[in-house]
Structure formats: C-alpha cells, structure tokens
C-alpha cells in the first residue's frame, strides 16, 4: 500500500511541476495577472508543499483534487482565449488537443490508481463530471465555430465527425457518472419537482445544458457529415490522443440526438418549467431528425 501511495504522489508531483511551468509561460505571454492563473498557481504551490512531506503519510486523494482544481482553472483561461478569438484555424487543432490532454490527466491517473483496491475513488463523481463536461463543452464550442466555415467543411467534414463523436461521448459520460435517485417510500422530498429531476439523473443546470449540447452536436453530425459512408459512424474516438475511449465505437447521430433531446424537452417543460429553459431549438432539431427518418 505504501509503495502505491508513493507512486501516486510522485506522479501527481511531476504533473504539477509541468502544469506550473505551463502557467508561467501563459502568464508571461498574457503580460498581465489573471485570476484563474493565479488561483491555479497557488493550488500547485500548495500541492508542491504537500508532496514534499513524507510520501507514505500523504493523502493521494487530496493531492489529486488539488491538481485537478489547478488544471480546471488553467485550462479555463486558455479556453476563454480560444473562444474570444473564435478558434483561429492555424493553431486551434493543436491547442484543443493540448487542453484535452491536460483535462484528461487527472482521470487517467485516477483510473491507474484504481487498480490498487485501497486507492479506489481518488476523484469523486463531481470532479469527474466536471472534467468530462469541460472536455465535451470545449469540443462543442470548437465544433460550433467549425460549422460556420463552409470551405473548411467541404474539405474536412471527416474531422468534424471525429470531433463531434468525441465531444458527444464526453458529455454522455458526464451525464452517466451518477445513477438516478430511486424514489421510494423511504426517501422523502419536500419539492416534488426536485425529486423528479433526481430520478431522471439531472443533478444540476450543467446536466441540462449537457443534454442540449450533445443533441445539437448530433444535429451537426447528421447535417454536415452525411457524405460519409454511413449514418452509423464507426470512428476512432481517440481523436486527440486523450479521449474518454480508446477503441472504435458506433454512434448513430440521429438515434442518440433524438433520445437526449426528448429527455431535455421533457425535463425543461416538466420539473424545470418555472425556470423557462428554451426548448424551441431542441424541437426544431427533433423535427429535423424525424424528416431524416422518414
């Protein structure tokens, strides 16, 4: 057990040093202090101090959580820059790949550590959800930008297809980390709408947004990638080298999109009706799916 803990601590420390060097580079390039970079750097400094203690006494879960929070802040700064610049065509593919790799490291390390029975669950469900959400949302924003570039689409719709599949998989992964709450006589809820949401696996507004994002990405896939060999896209979902899957999967854009958007509309017009979520776009996409089916 001690050897396993020491191994995790060493690996987290190495990753933390790499991230700190990257933050230094970003700060120098920006030429000004940024709140997210400052917070990320502070977390990594604390991580470094904790890793300097006796490794056998360190809590690997706390260390990995600190590292994860730093990565989330650091990559958020870079994502905002890409969005503000509308994903420049020359550098965005490599930059998105780097960001996905950073956001995948905590999950990869947690999975490797889970091979040791006493190191299971190093990252809680909420952090794992956040990592998947951030990767899926990044690819959503990137694909949204790409769908507005007609010449690029004519040349590289196969790349869009791969980006979409990876993004959808990340969002579906995020939605499936926690099981829906089973409602029974032993569980009491003062708010019936909250109970309905939890029973469908919707735990936050981000879960609702993830459903809309994944449905919209399925729409883009069906609209822009129909010149591919089949509407059932069997692709290598390890597009950027740090995907949530490392094998070939079949993803039917229409089937997946229809299922997730029907749930989105049901939730928004049911338990979330008072919050006035917009369902017009979702219904238009569902109509598009029906036309493609007939």
From Swiss-Prot:
GO terms for cellular component: cytosol; nucleoplasm. Its main location: cytoplasm. It is found in: Cytoplasm, Cytosol. GO terms for biological process: mitophagy. InterPro entries: RIMC1 (IPR037657). Belongs to the RIMOC1 family. This is RAB7A-interacting MON1-CCZ1 complex subunit 1.
